[in-house]
Amino acid sequence: MYGFSVYLNEAIDRDHIDRMVAAGFTGIFTSIHIPEDDSTAYLDRMQDLGTIAKAYDLSLVVDISGTSLHKIGGSFEDIRPVIDLGVTGLRIDYGIGFDMVARLSREIHIALNASTLTEQDLEQLHYYQADLNQITAWHNYYPRPETGLDMDTFKRHNRWLKSTGLRTMAFVPGDDKMRGPIHAGLPTVEAHRSMHPLAGTLDLITNGNIDDIYIGDPTISREVLFQFKEYIEKNRICLRMESARDAVAERVEWILGDHTNRQDAAALVIRSQESRRQLRSNDPIKAVNTDARQFGAITVDNEGYGRYQGEVQICKVDLPQDEKVNVVGQVVQTDKSLIPYIGPGQTFRLLQK
C-alpha cells in the first residue's frame, strides 16, 4: 500500500487528496496528538477527512495518545463514534496497555510502534487474545535531523517483525511543503531525509523489508507525484533529463520515451534493449559530444561502435571519455538516486526537464 499524510492543523484540501488518489495512493495517515496543533478544530476537520476517505474507500489511520480520542468524539470505552467518522485504524505508541490494545483490535485495525515492538510485547498480545490479523507494525517518522533510524538496524528488526507475520510500514519525506515546526522532512530512515521520495520508497521496498510506505510530509511536488503514479500503476521509473549543450536535437528527441533495461543487466550502465531496434534512420550516427561520462550521463553509441550504433545507455558510475560514445544528456541531480533501482528487466522513461 502507498499512503500519504493529511494534518488537521489546516483545512482539508480536497483537491490534494483527489490528486493523490488519482496517482494510486490508497491510505491516509493523520494525527490528533501533535503538541504544536490547535486541537479545537480537530473534530470538524476529521469529519471532513473521514467523509472523503469513505467516498474513496481509503484506509484512514489516526495517531493517538492515551488521552486524545475525546478530541474526535470517541473514547476507549466506546470506539464506535470514531469508526463512524471513517477512521479504519488507530496508530498507538505509548500510554495504552496491551489489554486495551487487544480489546481494541477486535473492533478496529491497530498499528503499533514497529521500532520498539519486542517479543515480550507480542506475548502480551497473545495473552490478552488480541486479533493479530488486525495488528500491523508502523514505524515513526523523525522530524529532527540526525534522529532518523539507521538502515541496517532498521531492516534487521523488520526482518524479525515479518517473521512473526506482522505487516510493516514506514515513512518517506516529501519534497514540497514540509511540515513544521522544523521543516526538515519526515522520514523514518535518516538516510532518506534529503533523498527523492520515490528513491526512499524503492529503498524501503528493495532493502528495508517494508510492505507499506506513506509520505510523511503534507505534500509532494507535481513532478514527483507523476513519478509515483507511473511506478504505482505501471511499475515504470521516470527519469528527468537535461540535454547536453551540443547534443543534436533530433537525437535527444529520439531517446525520449519508454525503455527497458536488458534482462542481462550490465554492471556499469543501464542498456536500453529497444534502442538499437528503434533507430529511425539508416544515416550513421556521427561522433559528437564524446565527453567523459559522469554518473547519470545518457549516451548513444555512434558509428564507431559498429553494430552497437544507436544503443542508449545510462551510466551507473563515472566512466571515461570514449570516441565511440556520444553524451546526449544527463539525468537531473534529484533523480539520480532512482538509477540504482533500474534493475534487470525494469522499464523506465526518459523525460525532457
Regions found by a protein language model. Give the residues of each.
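N-terminal active-site wall of soluble small-molecule enzyme domains
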Residues: 43-87, 98-100
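Short, acidic/polar
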Residues: 9-22, 71-81, 121-125, 196-203
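C-terminal functional modules
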Residues: 245-353
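Glycine-rich, proline-tolerant flexible connector loops at the mouths of alpha/beta enzymes
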Residues: 26-49
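Hydrophobic faces of well-ordered beta-strands that scaffold small-molecule active sites
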Residues: 2-6, 28-30, 58-64, 88-92, ...
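Catalytic alpha/beta core domains of metabolic enzymes, predominantly
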Residues: 115-247, 252-254
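Active-site mouth loops of central-metabolism enzymes
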Residues: 1-15, 62-73, 116, 183-195
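Active-site-proximal loop/turn and secondary-structure-junction residues that shape catalytic pockets
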Residues: 6-12, 32-36, 64-68, 94-98, ...
